[in-house]
């Protein structure tokens, strides 16, 4: 890691011998637990948590996606005043992409669930998921579920980008399962911690950009750079510093700001960081060129992973919302 990028914390330590590009589910689960222990307790204050998430993103982008989901699940339990299953690896499966999601109703002590979950990250890897179930009256409840044996469809993931996040599709039809309800109906979307969670994701994006920058620095040493490449490196350094500053500023506001301002702060973080990350990716592609992207597996994987990951940010929707606030 270059001293030029020490505005961000260093990467965390991976388990010895961990294969970034060919790990199995068991190895990934162990790596999630290993990294989560370094991130620390879910109740940490935001400025401390953001530093850990920046370091996490700098470590490995697909793994960071999974660890961030685990940490988010533990924070949700903490906000609800409920307890997670001890030593379980968690995820949050709450995507409603293209009007998907699970409907559910109680039948005795069991829940009956139907529907489609897209982007179920960690499918086949994690032990438990926090999943919103939508009720007949339009409200929702958040359920803590054992998802370790749920079947999933991996054929729909057609890209190598983020493939090791194992974000697969799950289809359920009248699936009976035991579950623990987390919070009251409406808790998941209505809790004060919902929007701040997006700032945590932004910190992982910023850390992921630092990983890309580290790899680019190794691929194109200073003594071999053209003037144009040197300019691009300067732009990368500036955008990394900006992204880190945005994350840290928003983290401070999470601790001191009014609850009503949390959505604005989190949206500013996501929008500001995503813009920096996209520019870093553009500069990285320009510096590396076809040869660098074709021949350096670590670099090209990191670029592709981060491009897809930050692609979940809807820049136009967030800009429209921010522009409409007085």
Where are each of the predicted segments found?
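Generic structural signal for well-ordered, non-transmembrane alpha-helical segments
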Residues: 207, 234-241, 267, 271-278, ...
């Amino acid at each position: 890691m270059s001293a030029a990028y020490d505005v961000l914390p260093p990467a965390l330590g991976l388990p010895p011998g961990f294969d970034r590009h060919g790990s199995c589910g068991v190895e990934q689960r162990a790596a999630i637990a290993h990294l989560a222990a370094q991130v620390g307790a879910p109740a940490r204050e935001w400025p401390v948590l953001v530093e850990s998430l920046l370091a996490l993103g700098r470590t490995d982008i697909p793994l960071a996606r999974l660890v961030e989901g685990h940490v988010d699940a533990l924070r949700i339990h903490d906000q609800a005043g409920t307890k997670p299953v001890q030593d379980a690896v968690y995820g949050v499966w709450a995507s409603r992409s293209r009007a998907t999601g699970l409907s559910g109703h109680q039948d005795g002590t069991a829940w009956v669930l139907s529907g489609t979950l897209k982007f179920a990250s960690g499918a086949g890897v994690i032990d438990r998921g926090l999943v919103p179930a939508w009720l007949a009256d339009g409200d929702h409840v958040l359920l803590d579920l054992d998802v370790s044996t749920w079947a999933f469809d991996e054929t729909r993931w057609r890209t190598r980008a983020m493939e090791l996040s194992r974000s697969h599709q799950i289809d359920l039809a009248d699936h009976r399962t035991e579950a623990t309800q987390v919070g009251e109906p409406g808790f998941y979307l209505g809790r004060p911690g919902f929007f701040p969670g997006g700032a945590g994701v932004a910190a992982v994006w910023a850390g992921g950009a630092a990983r890309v920058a580290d790899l680019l620095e190794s691929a194109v040493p200073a003594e071999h750079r053209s003037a144009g490449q040197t300019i691009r490196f300067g732009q990368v350094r500036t955008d990394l510093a900006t992204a880190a500053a945005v994350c840290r500023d928003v983290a401070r506001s999470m601790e001191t700001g009014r609850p009503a301002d949390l959505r604005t702060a989190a949206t500013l973080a996501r929008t500001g960081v995503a813009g920096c990350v996209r520019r870093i990716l553009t500069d990285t592609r320009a510096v590396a060129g076809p040869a660098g992207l074709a021949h350096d597996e670590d670099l090209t994987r990191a670029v592709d992973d981060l491009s897809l990951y930050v692609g979940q940010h809807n820049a136009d929707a967030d800009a429209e919302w921010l522009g409409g606030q007085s």
